[in-house]
UniProtKB/Swiss-Prot annotation:
Keywords: ATP-binding, Chaperone, Nucleotide-binding, Phosphoprotein, Stress response. This is Chaperone protein DnaK. Residues 625-637 have a biased composition (Acidic residues). Belongs to the heat shock protein 70 family. It comes from Solidesulfovibrio magneticus (strain ATCC 700980 / DSM 13731 / RS-1) (Desulfovibrio magneticus). Residues 593-637 are annotated as: Disordered. InterPro entries: ATPase_NBD, Chaperone_DnaK, Heat_shock_70_CS, HSP70_C_sf, HSP70_peptide-bd_sf, Hsp_70_fam. The keyword ATP-binding applies. Induction: By stress conditions e.g. heat shock.
Length: 637
């Protein structure tokens, strides 16, 4: 069995580690670098890494960088539209509405471009080890959703790698940090890389790494800081020369290179100068750029970006049930944490000096290699407990999002719950799988849908539909539904290539807080409607069964109150519906007594489950778990 390599597939740079005995070692590339630029260029041949980066200025439209930002995203996502304004290569709508890149008329999915980078890393590892490499552990941002994780796994498969495990980047970093540490510590891993930001709260020590909570922003990173510098340089040049460089792709590529360099220099220097001769030309001749940037100016340009990291930190601590003072160490990961303003912000929030004992560019790959060693059996007695970043569940009666698995649940995990039907003789139920934090289904993100068909004729509320969610150690979701009466079962593996955009993810959680009161009212209204609907159904059924056995006065009184409930259900006034329902409930007590007497005389017993969901959707309660059988389903993009 060959080595399992650990890969940090980064937005800006990627890194590979491998276990040699009990020690993780960095795999250097043929150019001598410990990290490889995540860049692919198309010329007469395909270039990857440093060689692709070097020719980017003269080949901007065919040089693809930061492809990770498009992984699992739809073309019409706000982040993709924003990215379109800043990148020189062409982004187009691909299969199923996904964001693809186009080079010389050919479309490439983000997974394909990522696979080219992974292929280069695989080749470098084989050259370093002197043996074939077929297995890998690949890291992803903790806040990557199911589709983005699946796309990453697909990229590995395209590159000829069996992805043994998808591991969260902050978790990998903590694994490397906590490797061989005996003392128990509560740590925060603050990971600000080239394209994404993650914060994870963990407990490490005595060979156990347990994630308590995670949060983040999958569209915040060094690329955004670079864009602020580029925009500043473009504005300064326009003020001085009256020429707008924002539409000049070659000039923008030079500015990107210079802006990134200036940003890095200002982490150690107080001032730097961007000097770009022959940046453009007009009728009067060639133009040169010479702009001085101070550290203070840079910090004023990116201050709001740095502040965006604070709220996820606050949420992660709250989810973990901890205060900032409870954290023993704050570990900095990702190149952007070298920026003084970032480390200062971290120190102010957590009230302690950040821990700089790990290499922020390599620690994630190191942790991935350690995880590879655990899977291969080379690293003993290390237990890693990770979590799922967002809640998962299904849509139930009235458009309510019923959670089966809460966010920050330790994975792998499996959860089942029993639901029922909403209509008499309902032949099928539609299972609408969702991910998010809002109470209402349409405020969350659809992962997929599938049908459980062939239900035998039965009154509403009688069928028992057991829905099971299964999340594996990679964070990838499987859902099944089983009719416990007939044993019929169908399932879906959530494999949609398009995923949640960062705006969607943030909307899910931020809206959940800012609209908490509104959500509460909506949910209360749905519950009251469900109660009223159930009471109307059972009352009408009882009236029909009793027939002539009920006197006209009682029947008239009940029917009047029944019609009143139906009228209030046409509106949105929860109080009015509740009052009408309470009136009907009191009036129908007599009816229930008569029905009970009738059943007793016939030797039968009243009862049966209450009604559940509407429109072919499931309705409500709990249950066990079973094996899964594949079935056809509609993939939602």
């Amino acid at each position: 069995m060959g080595k399992i390599i650990g890969i940090d597939l980064g937005t800006t740079n990627s890194c590979v580690y491998v276990m040699e005995g009990k020690d993780p070692k960095c795999v250097t590339n043929p150019e001598g670098g410990r990290t490889t630029p995540s860049i692919v260029a198309f010329t007469k041949e395909r270039l990857v890494g440093e060689i692709a980066k070097r020719q980017a200025v003269t080949n901007p439209e065919r040089t693809i960088f930061a492809i990770k930002r498009l992984m699992g995203r739809r073309y019409d996502a706000p982040e993709v539209k924003h990215w379109l304004e800043h990148c020189p290569y062409k982004i187009v709508e691909g299969q199923g509405g996904d964001a693809y890149v186009e080079v010389e008329g050919k479309k490439y999915s983000p997974a394909e471009i990522s696979a080219i980078i992974l292929g280069k890393l695989k080749k470098d590892a084989e050259a370093y080890l002197g043996e074939p490499v077929t297995e890998a552990v690949i890291t992803v941002p903790a806040y990557f959703n199911d589709a983005q994780r699946q796309a990453t796994k697909d990229a590995g498969r395209i590159a000829g790698l069996e992805v043994k495990r998808i591991i969260n980047e902050p978790t990998a970093a903590s694994l490397a940090y906590g490797f061989d540490k005996k003392a128990n510590e509560k740590i925060a891993v603050f990971d600000l890389g080239g394209g994404t930001f993650d914060i994870s709260i963990l407990e490490v020590g005595d060979n156990v790494v347990e994630v308590r909570a995670t949060n983040g922003d999958t569209f915040l990173g060094g690329e955004d800081f670079d864009h602020r510098v580029i925009s500043y340089l473009v504005d300064e040049f326009k003020k001085e020369n009256g020429i707008d460089l924002s539409q000049d792709r070659m000039a923008l590529q030079r500015l990107k290179e210079a802006g990134e360099k200036a940003k890095k220099e200002l982490s150690t220097a107080m001032e730097t100068e961007v000097n770009l001769p022959f940046i453009t030309a007009d009728a009067s001749g060639p133009k040169h750029m010479m702009v001085k940037i101070t550290r203070g100016k840079l910090e004023s340009l990116v201050d709001d970006l740095v502040k965006r990291t604070v709220e996820p930190c606050r949420k992660a601590l709250a989810d973990a049930g901890l205060k900032a003072s409870d954290i023993d160490e704050v570990v900095l990961v990702g190149g952007m944490t070298r920026m003084p303003l970032v480390s200062k912000t971290v120190q102010e929030f957590f009230g302690k000096e950040p821990n700089r004992s790990v290499n922020p560019d390599e620690v994630v790959a190191m942790g991935a290699a350690i995880q590879g060693g655990i899977l291969a059996g080379d690293v003993k007695d290390v237990l890693l407990l990770d979590v799922t970043p967002l809640s998962l569940g299904i849509e139930t009666l009235g458009g309510v999002f019923t959670k089966l698995i809460e966010r920050n649940t330790t994975i792998p995990t499996r959860k089942s719950q029993v639901f029922t039907t909403a209509a008499d003789n309902q032949p099928s139920v539609s299972i609408h799988v969702l991910q998010g934090e809002r109470p209402m289904a349409n405020d969350n993100m659809t992962l997929g849908r599938f049908e459980l068909t062939g239900l035998p004729p039965a009154a509403r509320g009688i069928p028992q539909i057991e829905v099971t969610f299964d999340i594996d150690a990679n964070g990838i979701v499987n859902v099944s539904a089983k009719d416990t009466g007939t044993g019929k079962e169908q399932s879906i593996r959530i494999t949609a290539s398009s995923g949640l955009s960062e705006a969607d993810i943030q909307k899910l959680i931020k809206d959940a807080e800012s609209h908490a009161e509104d959500d509460k009212k909506k949910q209360a209204l749905i519950e009251i409607r469900n109660q009223a609907d159930t009471l109307v159904y059972t009352t009408e059924k009882s009236l029909a069964e009793l027939g002539e056995k009920i006197d006209g006065v009682t029947r008239g009184e009940i029917e009047a109150k029944l019609n009143n409930v139906k009228e209030t259900l046409k509106g949105e006034d929860a109080d009015a519906i509740k009052r009408a329902t309470d009136d009907l409930s009191q009036a129908s007590h007599k009816l229930a007594e008569k029905l009970y007497q009738q059943k007793a005389e016939e030797g039968g017993q009243p009862g049966g489950p209450q009604a559940g969901a509407a429109g072919g959707q499931p309705g409500a309660k709990a249950g066990g778990d079973d094996d899964v059988v594949d079935a056809d389903y509609t993939e939602v993009k």
